[in-house]
């Protein structure tokens, strides 16, 4: 069934434009409230948000929807996405909501939904919500005496800080470690510096003054240049780059070099395998993860299971097949021993634990394999289905033939933006670049002609 509202990570779009309007947000609250409320019992939703200005608008619309459906609402304020998932369980809520567009610019926003177990909702429930939104909502409203209440709660941010701190082994301290944290002017701007400082690190914080429109603006995990310069400038041991909702993380070593999610997963996989903590005989990643990671794991008799892009698909595969480590090259790292979704802070703490335990610099700990030359480019489209175009199909087939068995080609539409992502990797860098550029040119040409 075709989706109209939900993408790979909830509902997302430009604020005040379809589908990210107050009207639709209110209907989402009504539909979700009706599905998850417990008949004859008090039911509860928790709502968190990042630091986008439009978060206030969508928060109020969701509150109207949930309370109209008979649910009480706890408002958590600016807080990381993984904290919402954790607090959904901790506060015995029936549904958790995060208002965020993750790493996107401030003018975008989104709605992510978590069930009472802290996991993202299934495709079936999302389709049920869509069907309800498009119909008459009147039958789903609560009676006069059952309308819900809403209140803003204080202090729950500290529950999450304590939870994150407990994931660092008690025998390991961060004393003497100089850490620069790039908070992306987002949801992690309070929790990440506080947790690291309480664990003993010397913390230098950048991009921790959100104003509603500077989230992810030339900062955070998608723009780590400022962090690289800061780490080098203050001679820090490590830099930690979060994204707008703090569910992904990249590191910067003491030399100012970026360490991506593939390298971070390699560190955790090797460490946990050595201590018999790794489950499933390997890890789960997406089709975008580097071939070098797969070879690294194979050399250690560990497997790499690949899924479609999107941390929800990684988590689904982990749950179905018994893995406890998974993630994406972009920095979504899912450690199911601790969390139900990607968690930037907790993932960073696991890497710091390995470095402290081995008494080695981050550059030594996190350079586990030589990545195969890989190139990812995006091409913006103007609608239609360019991947079904004959010329585009022909270009893709030709590219696969040229790469042969020495590389991989992944082409997919973005689930959150009007983009086609083209990625190729292989041992021949020149060939990889040629293949990607040729496909980009054809898609651009055909998309323009169809506009």
Swiss-Prot record:
Activated by phosphorylation. Its EC number is 5.4.2.10. Binds 1 Mg(2+) ion per subunit. Its cofactor is Mg(2+). Disulfide bonds: none annotated. It catalyses: alpha-D-glucosamine 1-phosphate = D-glucosamine 6-phosphate. The modification Phosphoserine is found at residue 102. GO terms for biological process: carbohydrate metabolic process; peptidoglycan biosynthetic process; UDP-N-acetylglucosamine biosynthetic process. One of its GO terms (molecular function) is phosphoglucosamine mutase activity. Catalyzes the conversion of glucosamine-6-phosphate to glucosamine-1-phosphate. NCBIfam families: glmM, PRK10887.1. This is Phosphoglucosamine mutase. The gene is glmM.
